[in-house]
């Protein structure tokens, strides 16, 4: 089950990325129903020396094989196997700021720090109003 990311109950693949920057996700351990909410970007920026000048390059991330940053979650993936985890995309995001905002919003809404039902152990976000100026809450599922 957990081998592919799901978005609206369908497999999410490279060709569906479009102009999105990243996504907010939830990973569920099907053996004990414990969950993790996080964010992941489709690309990262690397700098490379080209003819004596620094050039920024957009490099694909490891989003297809990613299982979160929680060490406990990663240990459980090794113990139970990836097929016992459901990886679902909750929100596709057009910018880094919107990803950070929606991740924190989901984490606070679900009380991830107050519940033993979540792997999350901390919430870290730095978002300014200007980062989400183009975000329209009504257009996000």
Where are these regions (language model features)?
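Structure-specific nucleic-acid interaction/processing domains
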Residues: 1-141
């Amino acid at each position: 089950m957990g081998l592919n990311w799901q978005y609206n109950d369908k497999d999410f693949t490279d060709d569906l990325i479009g102009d999105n920057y990243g996504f907010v996700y939830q990973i569920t351990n099907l053996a004990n129903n414990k969950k993790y909410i996080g964010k992941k970007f489709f690309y990262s920026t690397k700098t490379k020396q080209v003819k004596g000048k620094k050039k920024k390059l957009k490099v694909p991330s490891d989003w297809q094989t990613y299982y979160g940053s929680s060490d406990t979650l990663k240990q459980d993936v090794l113990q139970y196997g990836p097929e016992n985890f459901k990886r679902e995309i909750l929100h596709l995001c057009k910018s880094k700021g919107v990803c950070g905002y929606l991740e924190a919003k989901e984490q606070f809404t679900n009380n991830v720090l107050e519940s033993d039902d979540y792997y999350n152990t901390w919430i870290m976000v730095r978002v300014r109003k200007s980062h989400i100026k183009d975000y329209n809450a009504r257009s996000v599922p």
